[in-house]
Amino acid sequence: MFLVDSHCHLDGLDYESLHKDVDDVLAKAAARDVKFCLAVATTLPGYLHMRDLVGERDNVVFSCGVHPLNQNDPYDVEDLRRLAAEEGVVALGETGLDYYYTPETKVRQQESFIHHIQIGRELNKPVIVHTRDARADTLAILREEKVTDCGGVLHCFTEDRETAGKLLDLGFYISFSGIVTFRNAEQLRDAARYVPLDRLLVETDSPYLAPVPHRGKENQPAMVRDVAEYMAVLKGVAVEELAQVTTDNFARLFHIDASRLQSIR
């Protein structure tokens, strides 16, 4: 079986007491059939640090972007464009809108979101989107900026079936994290049942949001296995099928050559 953690923050893990190094994290993941990761940046300096931390590997690719919660730290759009064009970068982001924590930066968030989509279209690289308390504006910007030209994923999806449908209409993929396993997430489970298999991704969002039965612990790529097993039950398929489908979806969205994944198997 071959699973992909489609969204993790490898630079945020506890390398002092839980993991020896990135090799250790990836070995723990591989032991649970999680054999490929997308390491997601939230600032430009963070991307550079993570690139140095992880190094060049066959089983890790990167995104480059500025998270909506980091809009108080100015950045140069040309720097974003230059770094996002690097060969190891497969996506723009994590970008999007978060009005829950920082509504005061709403305008800057929207401008940054637009820049990420525009660069994604220029480079033919998809966008990784975060949204919280900003559903209408997120959908509006995705439409207005013609996100269908580059594609993307709504990561760590927490919205309802209706929102999922609107994202699917835009050609988006939808990624589910450990939140889907939480006891009070029935609306999310309803949305997960609705999303077709060929638009589905699974992720950890490590080091956050560890799935049941690991609540309260640091999340890590190995735990995407728990998300996949839970999602397989929701979708009524074997976990092996869900693993294959989500891996194929990941490769298609992020333009990962099948031969690269085959070499890791």
Curated annotation (Swiss-Prot):
One of its GO terms (cellular component) is cytosol. InterPro entries: DNase_TatD-rel_CS, Metal_Hydrolase, TatD-like, TatD/YcfH-like. One of its GO terms (molecular function) is DNA nuclease activity. A divalent metal cation 2 binds at E94, H130, H155. It comes from the Bacteria. Coiled coil: none annotated. Its EC number is 3.1.-.-. Keywords: Hydrolase, Metal-binding. It is an enzyme of class 3 (hydrolase). Its cofactor is Co(2+); Mn(2+); Ni(2+). Has D-tyrosyl-tRNA deacylase activity in vitro. This is Uncharacterized metal-dependent hydrolase YcfH. The gene is ycfH.
